[in-house]
């Protein structure tokens, strides 16, 4: 390469080298800054986390674990990964952490790979009741490789049906019992599930991907004293980069999990992401993280109560966490139509099935809402009450217009208010 080509390679900005992609990134930045993000699994990371992810560590291959790599030149990345491991252990008060999984699904897959064989029985919460795809849903690897038995929630109150879980465990004698999910808003009784796991000889696994940040802050009961193994994502409430992690207090199981991650499921770890995990865990160890998580929980309660006041129903009657599942049937609108209408008003949500949903999965009777991203940008209880009223106006307008009618006037009015609110809480000051 010529000197000028090298200068461009190492010094040119993305806006100059790839304007089409740069335009897409700018479009996404303004979508995030000018709109209200209520998807419960999304958050806004710090500038420091972004910096770590965009660092030179993206250039480094590092198969293996700190001090035991299959490549040379790993001294610096060993430091980064060990920081992530040590901080994760300190944050959750556990003896072992594997920070290499590329996602929560990979973390769950590694646990299954370590503890079960194809054809074994696993017991998890059904997707329809608020569980996660990776806990045995039919289209997934866990649903195809294992005999996946599913428990749910009670029809009368939307709360986890512990009696059904216990009966299924005693009947099927699963190898693994899984707790946690993607749309269950209440505390889970971990000691009760561990008791039945011990009774039937099962491993007890908790997927705390959604509420890990609340656990770290002491707001949600920790599963670590009760579960054989805990998995999580590192984004969502934990407010780190997109990735996964495995935690346990059993060092012998930890050895199995290490082998299951590498070489079992993955090759080279993403060292730039692991460095960003270390940054996020360091942030979570600071006192203001607990304040943030308490605000996340308080804001969720305010949002839920505001919606209930306006005639909407919340599955299980409320929330103990950062998320809630809104039952739209009282307004005779679908999750799909509501999600799309809110989106045009610059409020991002996701349509979500409610327990015992009569609608098809692509339509749904509900939407799922969460407060982590809004809280990260500075929204407090007053703002979330305002957001709840905005949502109600969009839903009410949609209800009056009918599924095929136009809600454009309401969407435009609310959209202008959303932009005015967001302007008071800008993102990334140096963008």
Curated annotation (Swiss-Prot):
Site residues (Plays an important role in substrate specificity), renumbered to this chain: 235
UniProt-annotated binding residues for (6S)-5,6,7,8-tetrahydrofolate: 127, 131-133
Pathway(s): One-carbon metabolism; tetrahydrofolate interconversion; Amino-acid biosynthesis; glycine biosynthesis; glycine from L-serine: step 1/1
InterPro entries documented for this protein: PyrdxlP-dep_Trfase, PyrdxlP-dep_Trfase_major, PyrdxlP-dep_Trfase_small, Ser_HO-MeTrfase, Ser_HO-MeTrfase-like, Ser_HO-MeTrfase_PLP_BS, SHMT-like_dom
Keywords: Amino-acid biosynthesis, Cytoplasm, One-carbon metabolism, Pyridoxal phosphate, Transferase
Gene3D superfamilies registered for this protein in UniProt: Aspartate Aminotransferase, domain 1, Type I PLP-dependent aspartate aminotransferase-like (Major domain)
Record-listed N6-(pyridoxal phosphate)lysine modification sites: 236
Catalyzed reaction equations: (6R)-5,10-methylene-5,6,7,8-tetrahydrofolate + glycine + H2O = (6S)-5,6,7,8-tetrahydrofolate + L-serine
Any one GO molecular function term: glycine hydroxymethyltransferase activity
The EC number(s) this enzyme carries: 2.1.2.1
GO cellular component: cytosol
Subunit (UniProt): Homodimer.
Name this polypeptide is given: Serine hydroxymethyltransferase
Organism: Granulibacter bethesdensis (strain ATCC BAA-1260 / CGDNIH1)
High-level lineage: Bacteria, Pseudomonadati, Pseudomonadota, Alphaproteobacteria, Acetobacterales
